[in-house]
Amino acid sequence: MSAVLPSSASLYDRVRRVIPPIEWSVFVEDIDAILNLKRQRNAVILAHNYQTPEIFHCVADIVGDSLALARKAMTVDAEIIVLAGVHFMAETAKLLNPDKTVLIPDLGAGCSLAESITAEDVRLMRQRYPSVPVVTYVNTSAAVKAESDICCTSGNALAVVKSLGAPRVIMLPDEYLAKNIAAQTKVEIIAWKGRCEVHERFTAADIRELREAHPGISVLAHPECPPEVVAEADFAGSTAAMSDYVARHRPARVVLMTECSMSDNVAVEHPEVDFVRPCNLCPHMKRITLANIRTALEENRHVVTIDPHVAERARWAVERMLFV
């Protein structure tokens, strides 16, 4: 991957709307160091949409939702990939790049969904529902993916379910994503009990209050939100779909019912749009910082490894998804 990296000084013009000067003065040393380290080490940084603007807009080479990062990870030709996101994303990057070094800056960057289910849980579901295909959300460990028939993201879940041509499908582990997909298809969806700790806190009452306070506001919801929230929203979709919606429709005022940094990152691209922010922070995503990205590149921390037997089966489930 080749690119001319701008200086950190010019980068501030891009993010000044969401990063005050006093904060920028704290970030700039790490940003300069990271830009230099990437060149020296032939490294790229993949950043999820929930990363803070100083990471997303200033040091990342590839950005996007889980599906976009999975697709783009396959095209990376650098020797080192730093995943600015949570652990399952780093594992997915490693699955798709087994011969590259994949680093995650903080091993504690987990996910409530990934922690809600184990490989043994999937095996028990298979015993309970024999011959029913298992669709596993990418927000899971490699061990869980290895027990699955195919993976999905919030951006392609409906297409994945339809691609199986089955009357019944097990969909793990996000209960609300499964219910929201079930509302769009005649396929019977058997759900698990996992929930995203960020999205489960949004309520339909939140939306009604927003509409009362901001008449005419456009409400966009993530499909990990409860079904009643999705029903109240003007649009529901993945973070990439939300970003595309804002770019296409240019609403005067909008609220994104998702993680806080998403609004900041989209606002950088659309200064003409007024973003209302009743968001929820993801404590796991916020464990990734400029400081630990810099340390990851300086000290080669933390290298992602996956058991080869698990990796082979998990890779198949992820790659099958990418061909849908």
From Swiss-Prot:
It catalyses: iminosuccinate + dihydroxyacetone phosphate = quinolinate + phosphate + 2 H2O + H(+). The keyword Transferase applies. Its cofactor is [4Fe-4S] cluster. GO terms for cellular component: cytosol. InterPro entries: NadA (IPR003473), NadA_sf (IPR036094), Quinolinate_synth_type2 (IPR023066). One of its GO terms (molecular function) is quinolinate synthetase A activity. Binds 1 [4Fe-4S] cluster per subunit. Iminosuccinate binds at residues 48, 66, 137-139, 154, 222-224, 239. It is an enzyme of class 2 (transferase). Pathway: Cofactor biosynthesis; NAD(+) biosynthesis; quinolinate from iminoaspartate: step 1/1. Pfam families: NadA (PF02445). GO terms for biological process: 'de novo' NAD biosynthetic process from L-aspartate. Keywords: 4Fe-4S, Cytoplasm, Iron, Iron-sulfur, Metal-binding, Pyridine nucleotide biosynthesis, Transferase. Catalyzes the condensation of iminoaspartate with dihydroxyacetone phosphate to form quinolinate. This is Quinolinate synthase 1.
